[in-house]
């Protein structure tokens, strides 16, 4: 993978250069405005191109270091694009109403997420049959309400390392919370917005559906590039250290060169689908930082065997890698 490429022509075709009516402008955006035509401000794409590239690089670098990206876009025309892009790159999103304190009061939000998980378990199991129809309906409504607000972050496991925002005016509370916590903000900033406090300003139309789709696609691809880079670096480290580790260190220590993830990227895969993996073995794999089939699929023979020894089933390791490749591609 490589950082996603784009052209000024793509930005033009998506309508990125169209700002708001000139009387609705924010003077702080003057440096990013090329001029006005028919009472509509035109954004200077000669500045947008390098600034967007900088934002994409920041996203890729953040993910490559194991960081989390939170997509934020609650306006109607952004909701689907934000959710789809975040899911595609195994990141997180808020596309319904932003709950005050989502970042600054994470402890309370975590309690709500715990409640959402509990409701999911109750409604998807036989336990739901012990409730009356009215009680089940009440629980379902509560679950749906929580899922709209928290469904995109229920697997985040902690504060994000960067947020990407569509429409800084509408998402001003999210931006203020990120600023208070020193979380970098990459944002699409239209001519009626205030760029102050935005870490990575990307001047552009924040209303056009095609423009929003383009932004989200590029950010998602940048995040995927970061994941690819992280895995590539992992492979290089293992290859470079394999020979000396075999000579100088016991096998159990060699397994420590595997750099697992701090938490699942999105929803963790069901590792119990692998032959011989019980709930207890799955937990051991999780403790080693393995949550997804693609992580196992990319292991070489020696590293897979070392991890197999760590969980007590070294003879299964090669089979797990083969199975994981099939399951990851499914």
UniProtKB/Swiss-Prot annotation:
CDD domains: RPS2. It holds the Pfam family Ribosomal_S2. One of its GO terms (molecular function) is structural constituent of ribosome. It comes from the Bacteria. One of its GO terms (cellular component) is cytosolic small ribosomal subunit. The keyword Transmembrane helix does not apply. Keywords: Ribonucleoprotein, Ribosomal protein. GO terms for biological process: translation. Belongs to the universal ribosomal protein uS2 family. HAMAP family: Ribosomal_uS2_B. This is Small ribosomal subunit protein uS2.
């Amino acid at each position: 993978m490589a950082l996603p490429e784009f052209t000024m022509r793509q930005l033009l075709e998506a309508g990125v250069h169209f700002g708001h009516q000139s009387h609705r402008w924010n003077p702080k955006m003057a440096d990013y405005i090329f001029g006005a035509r028919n009472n509509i401000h035109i954004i200077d794409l000669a500045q947008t191109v390098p600034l967007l590239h900088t934002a994409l690089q920041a996203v890729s670098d953040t993910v490559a270091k194991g960081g989390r990206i939170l997509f934020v876009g609650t306006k109607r025309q952004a909701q689907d694009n934000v959710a789809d892009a975040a899911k595609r790159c195994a990141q997180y999103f808020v596309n319904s109403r932003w709950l005050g304190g989502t970042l600054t009061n994470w402890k309370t939000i975590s309690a709500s997420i715990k409640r959402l998980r509990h409701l999911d378990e109750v409604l998807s199991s036989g336990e739901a049959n012990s409730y009356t129809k009215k009680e089940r309906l009440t629980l379902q409504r509560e679950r749906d309400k929580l899922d709209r607000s928290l469904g995109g972050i229920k697997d985040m496991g902690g504060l994000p390392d960067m947020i990407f925002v569509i429409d800084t005016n509408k998402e001003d509370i999210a931006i203020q919370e990120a600023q208070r916590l020193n979380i970098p903000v990459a944002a699409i900033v239209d001519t009626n917005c205030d760029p102050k406090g935005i870490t990575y300003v990307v001047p552009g139309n924040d209303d056009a559906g095609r423009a929003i789709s383009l932004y989200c696609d590029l950010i998602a691809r940048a995040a995927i590039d970061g994941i690819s880079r992280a895995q590539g670096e992992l492979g290089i480290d293992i290859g470079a250290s394999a020979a000396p580790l075999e000579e100088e260190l016991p096998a159990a220590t060699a397994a420590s060169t595997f750099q697992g993830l701090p938490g699942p990227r999105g929803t963790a895969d069901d590792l119990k689908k692998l032959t011989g993996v019980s709930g207890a073995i799955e937990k051991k794999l999780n403790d080693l930082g393995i949550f997804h089939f693609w992580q196992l699929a990319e292991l070489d023979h020696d590293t897979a065997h070392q991890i197999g020894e760590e969980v007590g089933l070294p003879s299964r390791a090669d089979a797990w890698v083969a199975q994981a490749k099939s399951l990851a591609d499914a």
